């Protein structure tokens, strides 16, 4: 069974999927978030229809003191919606620096700042998911 990585942002959500052996992660896509959990649930259902997913791996951006950020509170609300709609397990991973890592990778690949915006969130989801896969091998 595969894992779905989720980088939940205030305006965009990045998605990544594991391979069938759960060895590596692949960036899937970004989803523009307008505050509608219903649209996110519909999008995730499309992933579930296409892939056999048993767990959602969600980035949880704690601050440098290990405390919840404002985004964590939104993610907590998002998790309530996931639990109401799906049976998959949910695992939170501290992802305080995944977006920064994603930006660095895109910069090193000589991708211009304007195009980085289109790729950063799904790359952050890929990093979150890969960190999880590496941790639980």
From Swiss-Prot:
Organism domain of life: Bacteria
Cellular component per GO, a single term: cytosol
GO MF term (any one): nuclease activity
Uppermost EC category: hydrolase
UniProt xrefs under SMART domains: YqgFc
Keyword entries, A-Z: Cytoplasm, Hydrolase, Nuclease, Ribosome biogenesis
CDD domains reported for this sequence: YqgF
Record-linked HAMAP family: Nuclease_YqgF (MF_00651)
Family stated for the protein in its record: Belongs to the YqgF nuclease family.
Protein name: Putative pre-16S rRNA nuclease
Phylogenetic classification of the source organism: Bacteria, Bacillati, Mycoplasmatota, Mycoplasmoidales, Metamycoplasmataceae
């Amino acid at each position: 069974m595969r894992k779905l990585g989720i980088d939940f942002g205030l305006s965009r959500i990045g998605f990544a999927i594991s391979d069938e052996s759960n060895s590596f992660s692949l960036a899937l896509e970004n989803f523009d978030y307008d505050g509608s959990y219903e649209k996110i649930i519909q999008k995730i259902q499309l992933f579930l229809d296409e892939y056999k997913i048993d767990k959602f791996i969600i980035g949880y951006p704690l601050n440098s003191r290990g405390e919840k950020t404002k985004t964590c509170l939104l993610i907590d609300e998002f998790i309530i919606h996931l639990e109401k709609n799906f049976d998959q397990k949910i695992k939170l991973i501290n992802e305080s620096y995944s977006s920064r890592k994603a930006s660095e990778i895109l910069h090193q690949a000589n991708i211009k700042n304007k195009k980085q915006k289109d790729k950063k969130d799904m790359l952050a989801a890929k990093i979150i998911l890969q960190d999880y896969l590496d941790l639980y091998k």
